[in-house]
Amino acid sequence: MVEIKDSSNVRKLKEEFLRDFKRFDTVEDFSDHHYAAEGSPAKLSLWHLKFKGRPKNWVKDIQKEWKILDKNLPETIFVRACESRIDLLRAVIIGAEGTPYHDGLFFFDIQFPDTYPSVPPKVHYHSGGLRINPNLYKCGKVCLSLISTWTGKKREKWLPKESTMLQLLVSIQALILNEKPYYNEPGYEKSMGTPLGESYSKDYSENVFVFSLKTMHFEEFVRSHFFVRSHDIVKACNAYKDGAPVGSIDKGGVKKQTRQRGSLKFRINVTSFMKTVVDEFVNLGAIREANHRGEPNPTLFSCFFFCYLELIICSV
């Protein structure tokens, strides 16, 4: 069993840091931003923008967005803007409970185009080379009707006089990082509720959680987040190893009583990758490792061996 290290003072400091961490703030530099090289090579400061020929109210529109974000961001979304490049934003979204993304951190780089708000913002997802959602590509593309990268009804698309950056970020969290992302794939929603569809959905969600375990002006926030959430993540992994279905865990334990069980492949993947997760938490000073689960589960061990053997055979 993985135990939590008795470091109440450190944990308290981390919790206080997260509590005081501003949901919206400005930074001095965005040189590592995905869109940093786009636009004018000159710094897009408020002073420079007066001479760049952009729409008259472009600066005011962006400043208005800043104010909306500053006042209305939910507890699970954090945004950083840059005063020297006011066209750029960076956001981190915390995966919601009840989804395969729970406790994960998902980063997005955003740019206000020169013709904003007549056109929607550009959004790039930092995927780490992993496909964790039908709407989030490995290359960083985000498919969402609100930003015109996917089809949608009129009210689902960007409306220059109504749509906001806050709406965009909340939409990514609610519509993309949702409970059953499998059905985000076009056409798959027709199988929702059917035995085959639910089976595929469960497999997809299990893979999403494992990928999320593998994943910028938020460095201290990230360290503190995972320090504080380490107990919940380890508890979830232990429950998943025992067969709990993915997304059924909250801070109080298994919240959904169901006959469904996590697949054997999922349990094996979590068991295998948990060593890496635990090592990172140990390095972070959040936990100490006594034993992942006492004696190894013979069923899991034997199945893991045969899966590994099959992988070797297929690769020859």
Curated annotation (Swiss-Prot):
**Keyword set includes Repressor:** no
Q: What is its EC number?
A: 2.3.2.23
Q: Which Gene3D superfamilies match?
A: Ubiquitin Conjugating Enzyme
Which SUPFAM superfamilies is this protein grouped with? UBC-like
Task: Tell me the route in metabolism or biology where this protein functions.
Answer: Protein modification; protein ubiquitination
Main enzyme class: transferase
Q: Which residues does UniProt mark as catalytic?
A: C143
Catalytic activity reported? S-ubiquitinyl-[E1 ubiquitin-activating enzyme]-L-cysteine + [E2 ubiquitin-conjugating enzyme]-L-cysteine = [E1 ubiquitin-activating enzyme]-L-cysteine + S-ubiquitinyl-[E2 ubiquitin-conjugating enzyme]-L-cysteine
List residues of the UBC core domain: 57-217
**Domain of life per record:** Eukaryota
The record's annotation in InterPro entries points to: UBQ-conjugat_E2_core, UBQ-conjugating_enzyme/RWD
GO BP term, example = protein ubiquitination
Which Pfam families does the record match to this protein? Answer: UQ_con (PF00179)
Keyword tRNA processing tagged: no
Assigned keywords, A-Z: ATP-binding, Nucleotide-binding, Transferase, Ubl conjugation pathway
Recorded GO terms, molecular function? ATP binding; ubiquitin conjugating enzyme activity
For this chain, the family text in UniProt reads: Belongs to the ubiquitin-conjugating enzyme family.
Role noted for this protein: Accepts the ubiquitin from the E1 complex and catalyzes its covalent attachment to other proteins.
Q: Which PANTHER family match?
A: (E3-INDEPENDENT) E2 UBIQUITIN-CONJUGATING ENZYME (PTHR46116), UBIQUITIN-CONJUGATING ENZYME E2 26-RELATED (PTHR46116:SF22)
Q: What name has this protein been given in UniProt?
A: Putative ubiquitin-conjugating enzyme E2 39
